[in-house]
Curated annotation (Swiss-Prot):
InterPro entries: Hexapep, Hexapep_transf_CS, LbH_SAT, Ser_AcTrfase_N, Ser_AcTrfase_N_sf, Ser_O-AcTrfase, Serine_acetyltransferase, Trimer_LpxA-like_sf. It catalyses: L-serine + acetyl-CoA = O-acetyl-L-serine + CoA. This is Probable serine acetyltransferase 1. SMART domains: SATase_N (SM00971). Transmembrane segments: none annotated. The keyword Transmembrane helix does not apply.
Amino acid sequence: MTAGQPLRDDPQPRRHSPPALHPAVVPAYPPPESDADESWVWSQIKAEARRDADAEPALASFLYATVLSHPSLDRSLAFHLANKLCSSTLLSTLLYDLFVASLAAHPTLRAAVVADLLAARSRDPACVGFSHCLLNYKGFLAIQAQRVAHVLWAQDRRALALALQSRVAEVFAVDIHPAAAIGKGVLLDHATGVVIGETAVIGDNVSILHHVTLGGTGKAVGDRHPKIGDGVLIGAGATILGNVRIGAGAKIGAGSLVLIDVPPRTTAVGNPARLLGGKKGDDMPGESMDHTSFIQQWSDYSI
C-alpha cells in the first residue's frame, strides 16, 4: 500500500453513518530512518490522543497518563508497557525504568518502534491511527517487550529476560523467546497464539497473522528454528518447523505446514505445504498483505 492510498474501497456512500473520527486515508510519511521521523510519528500520536480525549471524556485520564503527560514516544511506550506487564511482585516502576533505559541506550530499538507503527498503520485497514496501535495492538506491544528482553538476553540477564517473556505470554497470549532476532517494520496482526522459538530469525517488513508457530521439530538443541526473510507474509494458523529458510518476499498460506525451505518470492500452501511459483514483479507480500494471489495467480504451475 502506498502512502495516501485509501484503506478501503467504498464507492457507495453509506447511509445513516455517524461522522468518522478518523480519516480513512493513511497520511504521507517519511521512512523511519531518523529522529525527525520519530518526532513526526510522536506528534501524530499526541494529536490523535488530544482529539480522542475531547471526543470521549471517559478516556481522557487514561490518554493523559499514557500519552499526553510524556515528553517522548519512548517514555510513553515505556509507561504503557510497564503498566501492562507489571504484577504484584514485578513492579511497574521497575519495568518502566528498565524500558526507558533500554530504549535510551539502543537507538535501533527506537527506530524499530517507529517502523512497526508505520507498518501497522499502512498495512492494517483496521488500524485507525498511530495511537490506536501504540495503546491497543497487543502484537505491537509484545514485539517491543521482546526486543527489550532480547537486549537483556544478550547481556546475560537471562532470568529477567525470561520473566518478561512469561509476562508477555500471560498478558498478550504471544510467546516469543528472548533470544529470537526480530527485524523492524514487523506486523503481528491480531497476534493471539503466535509462538516464536529461541533460534528463530525474522527479517524486516514481515507480516505475521494470528496462531502462527515458528517452532522446532522435537527435542533437538542448537539452531533449530525457522529463518524468515525480508518482506515475507505468513498467513493465519501457519506452522513452520525446523531450521528452514523462508526466502525474501515469500508467502506462507493460511493453515499451511511448512517443513522445507521456501525460495524467495515463492508461495507455500497446504499441509504439508507444496511450493507454487512466483513472479519477479510481485509486490513484497509482507507489505502488500495479499493473502490469496497464490491461488488466483500462481496455481497454474508448481515447482
